[in-house]
Amino acid sequence: MLRFVTKNSQDKSSDLFSICSDRGTFVAHNRVRTDFKFDNLVFNRVYGVSQKFTLVGNPTVCFNEGSSYLEGIAKKYLTLDGGLAIDNVLNELRSTCGIPGNAVASHAYNITSWRWYDNHVALLMNMLRAYHLQVLTEQGQYSAGDIPMYHDGHVKIKLPVTIDDTAGPTQFAWPSDRSTDSYPDWAQFSESFPSIDVPYLDVRPLTVTEVNFVLMMMSKWHRRTNLAIDYEAPQLADKFAYRHALTVQDADEWIEGDRTDDQFRPPSSKVMLSALRKYVNHNRLYNQFYTAAQLLAQIMMKPVPNCAEGYAWLMHDALVNIPKFGSIRGRYPFLLSGDAALIQATALEDWSAIMAKPELVFTYAMQVSVALNTGLYLRRVKKTGFGTTIDDSYEDGAFLQPETFVQAALACCTGQDAPLNGMSDVYVTYPDLLEFDAVTQVPITVIEPAGYNIVDDHLVVVGVPVACSPYMIFPVAAFDTANPYCGNFVIKAANKYLRKGAVYDKLEAWKLAWALRVAGYDTHFKVYGDTHGLTKFYADNGDTWTHIPEFVTDGDVMEVFVTAIERRARHFVELPRLNSPAFFRSVEVSTTIYDTHVQAGAHAVYHASRINLDYVKPVSTGIQVINAGELKNYWGSVRRTQQGLGVVGLTMPAVMPTGEPTAGAAHEELIEQADNVLVE
């Protein structure tokens, strides 16, 4: 997570932003400079671009039986394959706890049929999303949320939401309902060994207020807003015990009606973060926290489309699979005493970074939302050979596997190795969008239908549409050849010059139109068949990013006839008449991001805080840190090469394409050297 956010930074630091919202929406602003170099002269334009994001969404969240993960428990109580060493536990009861031999033998008989299932991801996600929702409350930005309307003069789109934003809540409250819900049966526990087979939580370092917070996060979660992270969740256990020195009664008194809502409010975000920090640190749940943070970030937001077709992306909600809760860490007081076993180096690094700057989760979510949509769109584009050297043998099966779906999109977009979620059978996916030609019908109000594929007052969209500009992750190695996504490219001569224009291949035509739009020109064109309804390349005024047009996915269209280059009313840089052989010059184009800030409403502007990679040095004393050579498959990454997308165990950086198609070959030669060592 941290390394993904800092991937393009030259000084090993990154801009981080705290969660913010204006009725479920916020805007990211970038300051951009584009240089045009030709005839040994350099002209430039400095301009602002913006991208809206929405926190609104309604993911389908499933809680299924998952795998047990005992990482973090003391090494001497685990077997070589990561299971619990029961004999060592029983010996510890005899030697250290002073339990008589016959009592230990009786206990050993009782536990023969017990489950030793341990998975805290569901609880950690509840705690983490409660923290973010409470931050919105404290900023005066908590609301039900709404999706902004789209109106371009041709069509109008207003997608419905479940809860009216004007009638929704204005502050975060306990997500359970004491008047209708049944709550888990919980009890305080401090004995040396358990007597019944239920989850046992170890919350010994937490204050009473923090323990109450954990207990309430174990309860049912009702969806009270339209925000994606405010998803419905069942109570995590029917009954459980918590290991603590005191019996905590505040939550029980509130449930029984002995305390009012005002007397038992959710704690501040600072207290929530403190509880999360203590719970993860004491239970050594670094690996599981990594998984929880990944899942929450992957569903937290989506870009608000700047074109009508892009609204098809907002009509699809994620399918999320989360493992059911279980905990054995509190069953014995000594399980967490000693060196923590099998902690993954990346998880430990991200944990330290998030505790130093919780804004990392929100910033990462912004970047993932852009890369996910862009990667899914580029998957379809690349199948035609646009901007890459792939053919029909190209392997993209990683998109079809739920556990690698998101990572496949990230790798397809950025060229980086995209780390998996760190746990098997835990994922975010979009099952309706697995096929290239999936059709989405967007309900619209038609004003002027020219240029749109409209059937019965619905805009018909094939495949995953591009919904945003890439400036939040810019530059990225989206293709194997130089192009606008990578920040540097050259406008080359046309394939053929005619009296009324010039003929380009599809990639070169897009590069030409992109540069001309930034300079202040419109590019008009024709293509074979002329069935797509487009006559010029489109770019939204808010970001000036010329999208790859839909016709590139048409196998019958091989070339683009640029018929005219027209100066816009707002013109910025004088360029040669590039579609004429008499005036053509080779133009080098380079783009740089200077500054980024986010805005939620007219007066809420948030500038970046920064975190330095050299500052994030996780304490590994008493922790067995494992490196890439010892990872299980679910700690690998999805890698993009010229042969396709595949899962690998090592991580290496993306290679930004230059004038030659080097990305695929270079990927197979460059390997990031793992600097993590095994700490015994």
UniProtKB/Swiss-Prot annotation:
Read off the InterPro entries from this record: Major_coat_LA-virus, Major_coat_LA-virus_sf
**Residues annotated with N-acetylmethionine modification:** M1
Q: Which UniProt keywords apply?
A: Acetylation, Capsid protein, Virion
Database matches in SUPFAM superfamilies:
L-A virus major coat protein
Localization terms from the record: Virion
Example of a GO cellular component annotation carried by this entry: viral capsid
Q: How is it modified after translation?
A: Acetylation is necessary for viral assembly.
A GO biological-process term: viral translational frameshifting
Q: What does this protein do?
A: Capsid protein self-assembles to form an icosahedral capsid with a T=2 symmetry, 40 nm in diameter, and consisting of 60 capsid proteins asymmetric dimers. The capsid encapsulates the genomic dsRNA and the polymerase and remains intact following cell entry to protect the dsRNA from degradation and to prevent unfavorable antiviral responses in the host cell during all the replication cycle of the virus. Nascent transcripts are transcribed within the structural confines of the virion and are extruded into the cytoplasm.
- UniProt protein name: Major capsid protein
**Lineage per the UniProt record:** Viruses, Riboviria, Orthornavirae, Duplornaviricota, Chrymotiviricetes
